[in-house]
């Protein structure tokens, strides 16, 4: 069985959906006796250092690299190269991959050079196919939902709204604050997620909150452990995330599995992931409708969330990847 070297970016104190996926995948592949070795690098590693790391990996082994890093690949990798893509970096700011042409071209080159790709949803698979010049094997392996999130008791009398996601423009917190201006019901908002990733954006949000006199209503909790997030779920009425783009939407899926009702953006991937959960899909261009949806949920002393069984575990994720790659990279 070939050794697999998994190159993983680390984001200091930030916990991203991609980080959770990578870490859980490593744990579960090891349980399946896959000889996987971790190569952890800083998220902002430069091109030269990344290639030095790669050059130290035995040429007979296989490389699995997180797609966040592949735009830094400048020369051909001798090893068999496989890429795990949560979503392309060229779509981080806009859902038009051509908005950053240089980033798009570097990712396109890397995706096409890879032996195969792994991604997290069928929607993302269709997105990646647009980057490819020819057919390529793409494995879709949904993220697992940690059991601790499932089947929670929700406080139907709560007036607290929960939002989970790092404080970056793509998550749409500025849109949420604007929508809350027109909410007439009593409310508070808890935001869970690292607010040091984009200090300019965070400072702008704080100014917007002060301008609208919402300081006593909105609390930024920073990054939290899963058990701490579960505690926030139990204290909240519903979940909202007005995200502009997602590869999967792990925090949304976790809160839906817990039993919270959901308000989120009408994106194809979120319709795929959330299935039959009670979700209000909204158009970010219609803030009045968003305000109305928030008012509607706050005014009811009931919760329509469904406590569904986990549809995918991290063990399932690893087994799916193992089956896909058994004759490709592990042997």
What are these regions (language model features)?
Residues 223, 231-236:
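Short alpha-helical donor nucleotide-sugar binding micro-motif in glycosyltransferases
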């Amino acid at each position: 069985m070939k050794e697999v070297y998994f190159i993983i970016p680390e984001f200091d104190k930030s916990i991203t959906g991609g980080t959770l996926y990578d870490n859980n995948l490593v744990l579960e592949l090891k349980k399946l006796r896959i000889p996987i070795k971790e190569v952890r690098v800083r998220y902002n590693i430069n091109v030269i250092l990344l290639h030095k790391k790669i050059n130290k990996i035995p040429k007979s082994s296989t490389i699995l690299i997180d797609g966040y890093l592949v735009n830094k690949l400048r020369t051909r990798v001798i090893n068999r190269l496989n890429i795990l893509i949560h979503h392309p970096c060229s779509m981080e700011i806009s859902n038009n991959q051509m908005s950053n042409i240089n980033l798009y071209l570097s990712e396109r080159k890397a995706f096409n050079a890879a032996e195969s790709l792994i991604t997290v949803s069928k929607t993302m698979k269709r997105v990646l196919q647009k980057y490819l010049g020819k057919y390529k094997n793409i494995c879709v392996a949904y993220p697992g939902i940690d059991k601790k999130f499932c089947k929670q008791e929700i406080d139907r009398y709560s007036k607290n709204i929960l939002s989970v996601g790092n404080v970056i423009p793509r998550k749409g917190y500025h849109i949420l604050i604007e929508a809350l201006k027109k909410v007439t019901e009593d409310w508070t908002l808890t935001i869970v997620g690292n607010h040091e990733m984009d200090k300019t954006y965070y400072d702008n949000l704080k100014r917007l909150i002060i301008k609208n006199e919402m300081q006593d209503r909105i609390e930024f909790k920073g990054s939290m452990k899963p058990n701490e997030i579960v505690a926030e779920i139990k204290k909240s009425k519903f979940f909202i995330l007005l995200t502009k783009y997602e590869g999967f939407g792990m925090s949304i899926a976790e809160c839906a599995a817990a039993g919270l009702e959901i308000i989120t953006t009408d994106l194809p991937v979120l319709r795929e992931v959330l299935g039959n959960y009670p979700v209000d899909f909204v158009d970010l261009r219609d803030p009045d409708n968003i305000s109305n949806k928030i008012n509607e949920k706050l005014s009811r002393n009931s919760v329509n969330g469904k406590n569904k069984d986990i549809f995918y575990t991290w063990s399932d994720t690893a087994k799916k990847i193992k089956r896909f790659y058994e004759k490709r990279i592990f042997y």
